[in-house]
Amino acid sequence: MSVNPRKRKVVTRPAPEPSDSEGELGDGLLEGILSHSEDDSDNSREEEVDTDASSVIEGLSDEDEEEDEDSDSEQIRTEMRNLNTSDGPLRKKKGVPTHDMDLDTAVTEELEDDEDLKPNYTVTTDAHGNTRYIYKEIDPVYESDDSDVEATNTIGNIDLKYYDEYPHIGYDINGKKIMRPAKGEALDALLDSIDIPKGWTGLTDPQTGKPLNLSEEELDVLKRLTRNEVVEDGYDPYPEMVAYFSGKQEIMPLSAAPEPKRRFIPSKHEAKRVMKLVKAIREGRIQPYRAPEEQEEEQDAFNFDVWADEKPRPDNSMHIPAPKLPPPGYEASYHPPPEYLPDKAEEQAWLEADEEDREREFLPKNYDALRKVPGYETFVKERFERSLDLYLAPRIRRNRLNIDPESLLPKLPNPEDLKPFPTTCAAIFRGQEGRVRCVSIDPNGIFVASGGDDGYVRIWELLTGRQVWNAKLSDEEAVDAVQWRPKKDASVVAAACGENVFLIVPFTLLSPDVEQASREVLDAGWGYATSKPSTSSNGEAPKQAPGKWSRPGARLENKGVLVQVEVRSAVKIVNWHRRGDYFATVSPRGQSTAVAIHTVSKHLTQLPFRRLKGIAQTAQFHPSKAIFFVATRNTIRSYDLAKQELVKILQPGAKWISSIDVHPGGDNLIVGTYDKRLLWHDLDLSNKPYKTLRFHKEAIRAVRFHQGGLPLFADTSDDGTIQIFHGKVVGDLMENATIVPLKVLKGHKVRSRLGVMGLDWHPKEPWCVSAGADGTLRLWS
């Protein structure tokens, strides 16, 4: 539509005469109703002459040669549009805005009478002199929601055809009649179709009877719908999908329980059902749908060979083959050996026995030839019972685990990387008569002391294996224990023989300074014993001392045996304290006197326990603390000698403990048992064993840690072998000890089911000396 810069001519027309319909309706009834009709808007629009809108004419051309023709057609069109279809002139309503009136003034005059219809804004001027509209705040209770907007026509959902006979079409909220709006003629409809106003639909509002026009927002919605666009701004048609989200956002969860795992993993039951369907489809048991005509055509062709298209069908996945019958034995032969044929007594017993109690279902019989064998009487019965067993007895498939046993073992370091440790026999010490029961290496690593069944204590050179000293302590008793004093300032050997403990200084092997220091250590107690006051009072006999300290006699003193300690029962174990002033003895046959602690500097014997639970087997001092370990047959108790209280009870779970030894660090302990087990205890971890090692076939006699700083320990057994282990202990409490088997040393012979009786480590080198029941000592390096 083009705009003509020239103004069109003003066309005047006579006012129409009043009609009967106008007089019938009345001006008062049309007050506020016809003011918004199309006719009024057209009249008010055409009355304005000197505005720019009057120059806008649809279809007007700008060509000069067609100016006259266009002006005539425009004049005719304007006259047709300005025709009033009503019978009488409509006067200008009060407050109706026209182009001659200011818009704000008209609205104010229209809404003066009703406060509810007043505008919700105030007209002011901004800083630039422009008009500014200031709107009131919206009441969020009513004004923000149009769900309760009052309807203009309150007749409800009633068709307007029932009001065709009446001049009104309904009632407003105040009960006043809403008069029917004036209807234009066909010419008005034609003109309206030519000049279509904005928002025109050509429809009539069923409630008001007025033309139905659309607003800008509604037009925008229709445009978006026709373009397949989202109607509402900010609406996301494809929100992020959450599998467990219902679609409605809640402030609080309906259920805070976590989703089960079955929601996120495939269903096994559905997979089984699907696999059944897949298998049925592959086998042809499930066919796709076909029309009935095709099926009838296929039925016409007959296949007489039933198995022509037969294909081998694989067994079901749950199929388990029937177990095979055992093959027949010699007794089932028609010509069995004579030893399988029953005699008359056995045959009679078989016939008299009940069928369920018979060992066989038949009696063996002998036939000369196969043609003489008759039919088997119970053949059908056996086949029937076999069928019943296959039908009724459940079957099970037992899967064999093909697992390499080596893969189950822990990964241990290579023993070659853990050297040095003893591997071969370097020397053999011969000369002992009978079994060698005990062995000990001196703190300097030069001499080896041993004791055996012959009652001799012998001292050998470690490197050469030559015997350099010996002394016979008893003709009847065996030497059960030998132990060097751990201090290097003096050289003293403690040997247990029967009920006596002898303290020996082999002065022929010592230098004068060491000999003098050793004699002073042993002689210091004699003066203390002499000056000690008597414990008897009121004429009562003194109590018997637990140990009697005396000199052994001239014969033994000349040999270097200087002190003899006599206790109440036979001593089997002797262990020194780290300071060298105390040593403990264990007499398993004694009860309250089984464990005794002896003080060398005072020649004093003490019994630390009034009564002991169980039979004592061995005892050991802690290497750095005032803790004393006592092992009975089944338990190991640790006592604090300073506080005189029980610290801990270890439970190895063994039937009979043979020996124990404490790690130089003091936090670990190994236990040897007569039931062939070697146990490692971590004192900081638990009272139960940390590791249990079963490598021996016979009882374990002795266990020993290396005291020179090497991570080695060993045990001896009656099977004639010595097991060497790597035992690494670190200071980090979060890391456990590392135990690795290194070497099995074999060389001792077993005599009377006794093998290796004792063991001791070199104080510095990775060497060890073992004592065997075969009467020899062996140095392993």
Swiss-Prot record:
<dbReference type="InterPro" id="IPR019775">
    <property type="entry name" value="WD40_repeat_CS"/>
</dbReference>
<keyword id="KW-0698">rRNA processing</keyword>
<feature type="repeat" description="WD 1">
    <location>
        <begin position="431"/>
        <end position="470"/>
    </location>
</feature>
<feature type="repeat" description="WD 6">
    <location>
        <begin position="751"/>
        <end position="781"/>
    </location>
</feature>
<comment type="function">
    <text>Component of the NOP7 complex, which is required for maturation of the 25S and 5.8S ribosomal RNAs and formation of the 60S ribosome.</text>
</comment>
<feature type="region of interest" description="Disordered">
    <location>
        <begin position="529"/>
        <end position="553"/>
    </location>
</feature>
<feature type="region of interest" description="Disordered">
    <location>
        <begin position="1"/>
        <end position="103"/>
    </location>
</feature>
<feature type="compositionally biased region" description="Basic residues">
    <location>
        <begin position="1"/>
        <end position="11"/>
    </location>
</feature>
<dbReference type="InterPro" id="IPR015943">
    <property type="entry name" value="WD40/YVTN_repeat-like_dom_sf"/>
</dbReference>
<feature type="repeat" description="WD 4">
    <location>
        <begin position="652"/>
        <end position="691"/>
    </location>
</feature>
<dbReference type="InterPro" id="IPR012953">
    <property type="entry name" value="BOP1_N_dom"/>
</dbReference>
<feature type="repeat" description="WD 5">
    <location>
        <begin position="695"/>
        <end position="735"/>
    </location>
</feature>
<keyword id="KW-0853">WD repeat</keyword>
<dbReference type="InterPro" id="IPR001680">
    <property type="entry name" value="WD40_rpt"/>
</dbReference>
<dbReference type="GO" id="GO:0070180">
    <property type="term" value="F:large ribosomal subunit rRNA binding"/>
</dbReference>
<comment type="similarity">
    <text>Belongs to the WD repeat BOP1/ERB1 family.</text>
</comment>
<dbReference type="GO" id="GO:0030687">
    <property type="term" value="C:preribosome, large subunit precursor"/>
</dbReference>
<dbReference type="GO" id="GO:0000463">
    <property type="term" value="P:maturation of LSU-rRNA from tricistronic rRNA transcript (SSU-rRNA, 5.8S rRNA, LSU-rRNA)"/>
</dbReference>
<dbReference type="GO" id="GO:0000466">
    <property type="term" value="P:maturation of 5.8S rRNA from tricistronic rRNA transcript (SSU-rRNA, 5.8S rRNA, LSU-rRNA)"/>
</dbReference>
<dbReference type="Pfam" id="PF00400">
    <property type="entry name" value="WD40"/>
</dbReference>
<keyword id="KW-0677">Repeat</keyword>
<feature type="repeat" description="WD 3">
    <location>
        <begin position="611"/>
        <end position="651"/>
    </location>
</feature>
<feature type="repeat" description="WD 2">
    <location>
        <begin position="474"/>
        <end position="515"/>
    </location>
</feature>
<protein>
    <recommendedName>
        <fullName>Ribosome biogenesis protein erb1</fullName>
    </recommendedName>
</protein>
<dbReference type="InterPro" id="IPR028598">
    <property type="entry name" value="BOP1/Erb1"/>
</dbReference>
<dbReference type="GO" id="GO:0005654">
    <property type="term" value="C:nucleoplasm"/>
</dbReference>
<keyword id="KW-0690">Ribosome biogenesis</keyword>
<dbReference type="GO" id="GO:0043021">
    <property type="term" value="F:ribonucleoprotein complex binding"/>
</dbReference>
<feature type="compositionally biased region" description="Acidic residues">
    <location>
        <begin position="60"/>
        <end position="73"/>
    </location>
</feature>
<dbReference type="InterPro" id="IPR036322">
    <property type="entry name" value="WD40_repeat_dom_sf"/>
</dbReference>
<dbReference type="Pfam" id="PF08145">
    <property type="entry name" value="BOP1NT"/>
</dbReference>
<feature type="compositionally biased region" description="Basic and acidic residues">
    <location>
        <begin position="36"/>
        <end position="46"/>
    </location>
</feature>
<comment type="subunit">
    <text>Component of the NOP7 complex, composed of erb1, nop7 and ytm1. The complex is held together by erb1, which interacts with nop7 via its N-terminal domain and with ytm1 via a high-affinity interaction between the seven-bladed beta-propeller domains of the 2 proteins. The NOP7 complex associates with the 66S pre-ribosome.</text>
</comment>
<keyword id="KW-0539">Nucleus</keyword>
<dbReference type="GO" id="GO:0070545">
    <property type="term" value="C:PeBoW complex"/>
</dbReference>
